């Protein structure tokens, strides 16, 4: 039986945390003497009051979660956080439409980065900061953040971690999950601070550096300029952005082992990291060649633009330093492939994940060997660890579901009159949490405001399923989930 009281208790506490973050946005609005301060004060009061009501309902709950409770909690938290997160937009009037406000907020928390705002530069500083902060909070997971700072709040935190973490294997760097969470969030914070200081040193003002550092390390992609990082016309800023997008796409557990424990060889021997680097290098060289020969770019510009877009798409950040929509169409195919693949599991990026790519390639290799040696027992090993059959079954289930969901959503959009290329890349972008799309109607530098409202409501759960890796959400719609036994 689902324990709704403990779920409400945890959601109530999390809404207090969301109200706390809104307070910082209100401070930002007051500092800049802008009109959005009222919107944030009202929003945080609504959020805080609602959190109190949730806590009131769950006040006598036992502090323990079952596996079913964990799945329902994680999905509910992301939906409810997005619901309350849209209030600053609606109250201020920067987004007047409820559909657009919820879409923008869901896109923010899931770090998709698809925006319906045509001109972000007219927004006040508090609203801009809220957009960036949403992505930074969602980067490693809302509930995972809570496990790090308030471990006693989430009973059964291992089950919650399994429901919210990305990748087929949920690695822990310490026997205590709370310690793991604190270390991972420490690395995340260090990356964010280092990124912000680098941007500031390269010429950004403090507000620009703060916002771009949060959306870069969260691999979210929201920008405070319409032209994203292209606004600065600075190769130095481009290379800084590339560096921190790339680092944020690496498994944070691997970063911890390599940097904190000084085991540098572990990162070079890691199968997932090697595939990640290989895809980035291969795709960059291919696009660099195409830009040099077909667009007459000089070598440095071709290398920088190709590397930026490849890293941006594979880490599912979605920032841009040039309009890739004007590039040869073959580059769209390359970017579409890396967009679907994604970076490493256990990072802030979305997508299929390189670890699943490694597993898939090894299964295919073993299948060829099995044809030649029918009686051979061929285990799938990754980094010296045998992958159980259940994980391989889950791999193919996940792969099949992502393809089916992409095709289903694309078909609906094509019927709605959206061109084929846009329909496919929009679906891929949402299920992989990338943000930009490729096509003639909506390009990588355009907003998604032209989409019909009902399409936006279809894309919202798609973004959520992409962030929680599908199964966590879809299991709620199975009959067995709601059976008492």
Predicted regions and their residues:
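Membrane-proximal intracellular helices of multi-pass ion channels
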Residues: 1-485
């Amino acid at each position: 039986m689902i324990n709704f009281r403990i779920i409400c208790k945890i959601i109530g506490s999390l809404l207090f945390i969301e109200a706390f973050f809104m307070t910082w946005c209100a401070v930002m609005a007051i500092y800049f003497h802008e009109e959005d301060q009222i919107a944030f004060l009202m929003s945080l009061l609504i959020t805080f009051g609602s959190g109190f009501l949730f806590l009131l309902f769950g006040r006598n709950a036992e502090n323990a979660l079952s596996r079913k409770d964990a799945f329902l909690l994680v999905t509910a938290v992301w939906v409810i956080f997005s619901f309350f997160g849209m209030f600053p937009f609606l109250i201020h009037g920067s987004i007047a439409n409820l559909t657009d406000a919820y879409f923008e907020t869901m896109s923010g928390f899931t770090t998709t980065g698809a925006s319906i705002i045509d001109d972000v530069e007219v927004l006040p500083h508090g609203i801009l900061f809220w957009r960036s902060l949403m992505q930074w909070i969602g980067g490693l997971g809302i509930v995972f953040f809570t496990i790090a700072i308030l471990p006693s709040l989430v009973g059964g935190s291992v089950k919650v971690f399994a429901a919210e973490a990305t990748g087929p294997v949920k690695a822990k760097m310490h026997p205590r999950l709370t310690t793991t969470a604190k270390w991972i969030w420490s690395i995340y914070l260090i990356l964010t601070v280092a990124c912000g200081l680098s941007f500031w040193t390269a010429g950004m003002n403090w507000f620009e550096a703060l916002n771009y550092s949060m959306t870069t390390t969260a691999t979210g992609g929201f920008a405070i300029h319409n032209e994203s990082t292209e606004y600065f016309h600075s190769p130095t800023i481009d290379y800084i952005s590339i560096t921190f997008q790339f680092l944020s796409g690496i498994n944070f557990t691997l970063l911890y082992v390599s940097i904190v424990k000084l085991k540098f060889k572990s990162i070079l021997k890691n199968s997932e990291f090697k595939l990640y680097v290989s895809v980035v290098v291969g795709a960059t060289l291919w696009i660099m060649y195409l830009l040099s020969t077909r667009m007459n770019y000089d070598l440095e510009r071709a290398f920088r633009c190709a590397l930026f877009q490849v890293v941006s798409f594979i880490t599912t950040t979605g920032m841009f330093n040039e309009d890739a929509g004007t590039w040869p169409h073959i580059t769209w195919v390359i970017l579409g492939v890396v967009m679907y693949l994604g970076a490493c599991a256990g990072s802030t990026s979305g997508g299929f994940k390189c670890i699943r790519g490694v597993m898939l390639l090894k299964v295919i290799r073993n299948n060829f060997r099995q044809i030649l040696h029918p009686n051979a027992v061929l285990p799938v090993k990754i980094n010296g660890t045998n992958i159980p059959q259940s994980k391989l079954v889950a791999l193919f289930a996940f792969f099949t579901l992502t393809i089916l969901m992409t095709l289903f959503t694309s078909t609906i959009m094509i019927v709605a009159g959206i061109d084929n290329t846009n329909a496919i890349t929009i679906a891929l972008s949402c299920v992989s949490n990338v943000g930009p799309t490729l096509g003639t109607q909506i390009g990588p530098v355009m907003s998604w405001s032209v989409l019909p409202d009902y399409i936006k409501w279809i894309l919202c759960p798609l973004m959520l399923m992409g962030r929680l890796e599908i199964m966590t959400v879809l299991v709620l719609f199975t009959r067995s989930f709601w059976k008492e036994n």
